[in-house]
């Protein structure tokens, strides 16, 4: 029985936005605003946590910095947001009827039941960060991160090759 209760958790975790370019299920977008200076956005879907969204934005920053030969990078500013939308859930109505007859007499009864329906809120996290290439020692108190360290740790955490 415990195995079956894990199935929904496994299915939901498999549906979180993967590390990918922006598409229907979310992903990253980046723009180089000037040499070594980028604006990066990462948008999740309805089952992607804010933590994952923020870490994937950092992962994208580290990928860009690696491709530009930067030892470290600095996060200059960031903005987190949650987009909430509503989905109408399907409603099912079932009617059961019984007819009883005896001689010239008949009677009937019917029961109608309605299930489901209503609205479900869906929350989609998004983060946008501005980062710049900086060749300095890592100092998290100044939002300066080691490019290789961040890249390796986040790829290991999320099992990305």
What name fits each language-model region?
Residues 1-9:
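Sec-dependent signal peptide recognition
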Residues 11-14:
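C-terminal motif of bacterial Sec signal peptides marking the signal peptidase cleavage site
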Residues 16-161:
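Secreted/extracellular ectodomain signature
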